[in-house]
Design a protein with these regions (language model features):
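Proline-rich intrinsically disordered, low-complexity coils
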Residues: 10, 24-26, 90, 95, ...
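Long amphipathic alpha-helical coiled-coil/heptad-repeat bundle
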Residues: 2-237
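Interfaces and regulatory segments of ATP-dependent nucleotide/adenylate/phosphodiester-chemistry enzymes
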Residues: 143-354, 471-518
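Catalytic core segments in nucleotide and nucleic-acid processing enzymes
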Residues: 319-518
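Aromatic-residue detector
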Residues: 8-44, 54-55, 67-70, 74, ...
Length: 518
């Protein structure tokens, strides 16, 4: 199954320090000398280019005029020397590919553009091209910077754990945009949006749904989903090889909805308000005039099908009085919807063709109401035991953007390891090994345990994470001297169970075989 196979390309951003030895100006000082409207379109062009101008050669031949020949030649000579040194460095075991532009570069450029209040645009074209180039290299320096403490084995080589931590720092908060197709994400968001609204109809979220629809000007949630699907079709069907433009007819049909999810091209957004592109995610459209809107990127539009809805509902909940307000709103969503509604539904579906015991966390609670820390889902088929833990967590955006593994690791330990997630799995494994697992009185003599951690947020399921969490699990098990056969921990996105729901239910694929192959 493709979802379990990941090709990791060792791509390296070309940064300012690689090309220039002088002290740079702030990024804003370079960009403010260019035309804002042109810069906006350039950034969108890069975001939607699909890597067309990824290499330095493609960039300089496309975006520099002939009058900048000497400048371009100097840059290419410097980078060719850098490539040669890297190639001859015996410590670089894996060949590296250098690039200058990515979707992340374009998004960060757009964020910088909208943080500037005044543009002058008086410099000659040659200088403007050089300034833009320098700004891009500085942006690359910012987005590629990571902080991972080096770890060595007995042979003075980097440990696998060090490589795993480095991968997490490089991919986290970027992975979804760079590695998954927008069409794939769209389908998943539609499915989850559908189930979320169905859940709202028969839960404490009924008044929240009513207010949400009122705020967005719709009579029903099906109408809302229809309009959002129309919105995401614009960036998805972008066929002009530039960037999508939404043009309304003279009657301005759809204007109110688009306007509610947009901001003016003249708007100034301080970077503190757009950390992790929070502002862009809330308002994924740039309004040029009443007929013209520019989608910032496909994913931000797609997320209005489901992911962004949480934040709108949270604001609505905060505005209610105590008679309607849900205390502990985030916990309510993660427990009642994410776990007991969505997770239960799709794990049951995944195991539909399997025989044996299948117990949700609620089932376990009913069996022993006074017993705490029941498994989120337990399944035994013969000697094979599948222990599931489900986590719908959010990592602080400042921690994600900082790309400092000390801080990222602390967050992962707090939310996925200590007393939760991994530690919960270890406790259940110890109970099974000691034959005092109260939820299954007929444990086999020689069980085989498959520990599984299901994450709701696909942004967290990045290369390296599974290795880190399994390392934590194995370290705990060594301390406990467990005798039972334990397979390595597998981290699975809930999206995977949703994507292959039909295949699981019909028995065309089986979880046990997928895990063993993985």
């Amino acid at each position: 199954i493709d979802v379990f196979i990941m090709k990791i390309e060792p791509n390296i951003y070309i940064t300012y320090e690689m090309v220039f030895s002088d002290e740079p100006l702030p990024i804003s000082d370079y960009l403010k000398e260019l035309d804002k409207n042109w810069l906006i379109r350039f950034a969108l062009f890069i975001i939607y280019s699909g890597g067309k101008f990824k290499t330095l050669n493609n960039y300089v031949t496309t975006f520099f005029c002939k009058q900048n020949h000497d400048f371009v030649k100097s840059v290419l000579d410097i980078m060719n020397n850098h490539y040669a040194k890297t190639l001859n460095d015996p410590t670089n075991i894996i060949p590296r590919t250098y690039f200058i532009l990515s979707e992340s570069t374009g998004l960060e450029l757009l964020k910088q553009i909208f943080s500037i209040s005044n543009f002058t645009n008086v410099l000659p074209q040659t200088t403007q091209e050089q300034y833009l180039f320098k700004a891009i290299l500085l942006i690359n320096s910012n987005i590629s910077e990571t902080n991972v403490l080096e770890e060595f084995d007995d042979n003075k080589n980097f440990t696998n754990l060090y490589y795993a931590k480095s991968l997490v720092c490089n991919f986290i908060n970027n992975h979804e945009r760079l590695n998954l197709k927008s069409e794939f994400i769209s389908v998943l968001q539609i499915i989850k949006g559908y189930y979320f609204f169905k859940f709202c109809e028969k839960s404490k979220l009924q008044p929240h749904l009513t207010q949400f629809l009122k705020n967005n000007g719709f009579q029903s949630w099906t109408q809302y989903l229809y309009n959002v699907i129309q919105l995401i079709l614009y960036p998805l069907k972008n066929e002009n090889d530039k960037f999508p433009v939404i043009k309304l007819n003279e009657r301005l049909e759809g204007y109110n909805y688009l306007h509610a999810h947009s901001f003016s091209a003249d708007y100034v957004i301080p970077t503190s308000e757009n950390c992790d592109y929070t502002f862009f995610k809330t308002y994924p459209l740039i309004e040029i005039d009443k007929q013209t809107f520019l989608p910032i990127n496909a994913i931000f539009c797609i997320n209005h099908l489901y992911r962004s809805i949480y934040f709108e509902f949270n604001k609505i909940n905060a505005s209610f009085d105590n008679s309607v307000k849900i205390k502990g709103f985030s916990t309510y969503i993660t427990t009642e919807f994410s776990e007991k509604y969505l997770f239960y539904k799709f794990v049951k579906n995944t195991l539909y063709k399997q025989r044996g015991i299948k117990l949700t966390g609620d089932d376990c609670k009913k069996l022993f109401p006074k017993k705490d820390k029941e498994p989120d889902f337990y399944h035994r088929d013969g000697n094979n035991i599948f222990l599931f833990e489900n986590k719908d967590i959010k990592i602080n955006k400042d921690v994600l953007n900082g790309k400092d593994y000390n801080k990222i690791g602390d967050e992962l330990n707090k939310k996925l390891v200590r007393k939760v997630g991994v530690d919960q799995l270890v406790e259940h494994i110890k109970a099974i090994d000691a034959r005092n697992f109260i939820w299954d009185k007929k444990l086999p003599k020689h069980p085989r345990i498959y520990p599984i951690l299901v994450l709701d947020d696909s942004l967290l399921c990045v290369p390296g994470l599974n290795y880190i969490l399994n390392d934590a699990l194995q370290s705990q098990l060594k301390k406990c001297d467990v005798k039972t056969k334990i397979y390595p921990l597998v981290v699975i996105e809930l999206d995977t169970l949703i994507s292959y729901a039909t295949y699981f239910k019909t028995g065309k694929i089986h979880l046990k075989k997928l895990i063993e192959d993985y």
